[in-house]
Amino acid sequence: MVKKPRMATPAASKGVKLDPGMKTILEKEPGLKTTLQQIEKSFGDGAIMPLGASQKLTIDCISTGSLSLDMALGGKGIPRGRIIEVFGPESSGKTTLALHIGAEAQKSGGIAAIIDAEHAFDPSWAKKLGVELDSLLVSQPSSGEEAMQICEMLVKSNAVDVIIIDSVAALVPKAELEGEIGDSHVGLQARLMSQSMRKLTGAIAKSKSAVVFINQIREKVGVMFGSPETTPGGRALKFYCSCRIDVRRIGSLKDGEEQVGQRVKAKIVKNKVAPPFRIAEFDMMHSNGISFEGDLLDLGTENKVVNRSGSWFKYGDTYLGQGKEKARNFLIENPDVSDEIKQKVLAAGGFVAPLEVDADESEEAVEDGEAVANS
């Protein structure tokens, strides 16, 4: 009796070691072998695979410049390869937040780009926020279609870490620009955004880029119940976003009679990479944007890492200063103390394991140090 030849699996047919996950799946359903072979033949290697076979299951992130907002987003900031929307009223800090994200990407050796559809980009303000102007790409497109085409080309290059579009409301379709003022152009911008999202989503997912859309708010007419607020550009952006951040100004910061900043509340109204509806509050100064050290003091006090007695701030046996401003300056001048507080705050929030050294390990380290000193 002639034995039937064994059907080769997609990986085995090429002499490649079979992934354990794929092996388990094929043992459960042998009939999948032919289907998987056909899929890989038609669409190439890696067109379908077990999730565990992926080399990377964690999502890389870029910090927002605010530790409380990073924690609200899931611990590390905004995710790469995803679409993010930052929206809110005028002068709430949307562009400042987006530029801080760009500055943080540059600090880690990345490249940031801004597509300035509003034609209102201020280089001097960006520099104060820590943005390196020499490595910042800036484009001021003449139409919405041009802006989205530039964005698509930057994403497909896989060389840009953050692409900021400022703003969705200013992405004017070409037909509207070529028409007369007063002409009706119903749904043109929503159609532009819908088509752009369909084209961009796949390319963004395969890249290292985080695309940040800044958006304004409008009010719907005749709404009796619920919030009348909405954002321009239709519903497509809301659906395709992985994170949506609602930024609001909730108070003023004063030095005597002079207003030196504002208190900002950011609510994560949508999050596909962490639990949504978390809220972060932080200070945004008029001199240099988000106060990282001020935010760290608030979080440290809240998580009992930093003790506050009256107006004095104390970390362990170290007095940080009397008053928040002096304590903030102390942390700026002592980055090692600031980093230590940051790690303990993250550990208290459950985002990293607390740094602990066993007694045996510390004794070994001392002995090693003595041996080196005596040699």
Swiss-Prot record:
User: Main localization of the protein?
Assistant: cytoplasm
Q: Name one GO molecular function term.
A: damaged DNA binding
Q: InterPro entries annotated for this entry?
A: AAA+_ATPase, DNA_recomb/repair_RecA, P-loop_NTPase, RecA-like_C, RecA-like_N, RecA_ATP-bd, RecA_C_sf, RecA_monomer-monomer_interface
Query: What domain of life does the UniProt record list for this protein's source?
Result: Bacteria
Under the heading HAMAP family, the entry gives: RecA
Q: What is this protein called?
A: Protein RecA
Q: Which GO terms describe its cellular component?
A: cytoplasm
Single biological process term from Gene Ontology? DNA recombination
The UniProt family comment states: Belongs to the RecA family.
Q: Report the function annotation for this chain.
A: Can catalyze the hydrolysis of ATP in the presence of single-stranded DNA, the ATP-dependent uptake of single-stranded DNA by duplex DNA, and the ATP-dependent hybridization of homologous single-stranded DNAs. It interacts with LexA causing its activation and leading to its autocatalytic cleavage.
Q: Which UniProt keywords apply?
A: ATP-binding, Cytoplasm, DNA damage, DNA recombination, DNA repair, DNA-binding, Nucleotide-binding, SOS response
Mark the transmembrane ranges. Answer: none
Q: Which Pfam families match?
A: RecA, RecA_C
